[in-house]
């Protein structure tokens, strides 16, 4: 098992760099707008923002192919946008409107898209991990070469069902990538206060699952690690663990004042390690884009996000009859 530090790959072309920049910026601006709408009362219930962690899902989606699947926890808006789900439908679902992906009944934590192979959004910590293995088992049974990206956090990594899943996935050599989004805090509990193993990916060793730590504030490093993990799974070698070390700028949820860390800590990460600023710098210094080019992209992204907010506001609330549909248990 190895640990990977941030790297700036010179063989990445302009189109790829611009794609990463656009995708990460869309997630950042979308989440900022969602936070605003929550404050205005348009979005209710739980709302967990992905601000700061954008490079994780954008880098891994760049490693995915058509037909690959993804499943995650409650901090899921970024994953939806990164796999190509419509911002209008995502924002409308956040607002509990009929135009949302789950007809306004799922909200922030419980929407999905079969068309994009996005299987949720799950509110129970760690519960999505065995489901991800199940998705991978279906692909192995069908004898295709699809891969499932199963995302969970450093807090969920302490849940028992995760290790039951590791054992089964290794035993059956399932094509599943276990993605540990280590943002340093499980709600308000620092990782160092909740685990005696600072490198969570090493826990796979007992199940003969290879893995590595990745700089999650560098989208190029994430893409490189994602390519390696995907190749491993498609070759029929079984599961792979990526512990992607990242950082969330906002609280655990909109109701979290985040008093367990200092403002200076957050500001230091923003100033020195921000993934979007990192790619922006590469684009400019490498002459892949000009300041005007990036301003044009920023303007385009803001327009998309503002339109998603207006769509959500204009979309009606679900009809009363929807209370009785889509019930299976």
Spans of features found by a protein language model:
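Conserved acidic/glycine
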Residues: 1-56, 254-329
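Cofactor-binding active-site loop characterized by glycine-rich and histidine/acidic residues
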Residues: 32-35, 40-172, 193-196, 201, ...
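A general secondary-structure junction signal
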Residues: 74, 244-246, 327
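Short acidic, gly/pro-rich beta-turn/loop elements at beta-sheet edges
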Residues: 80-82, 188, 252, 322
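Glycine-rich ThDP/TPP pyrophosphate-binding loop and its adjacent helix/strand module
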Residues: 117-314
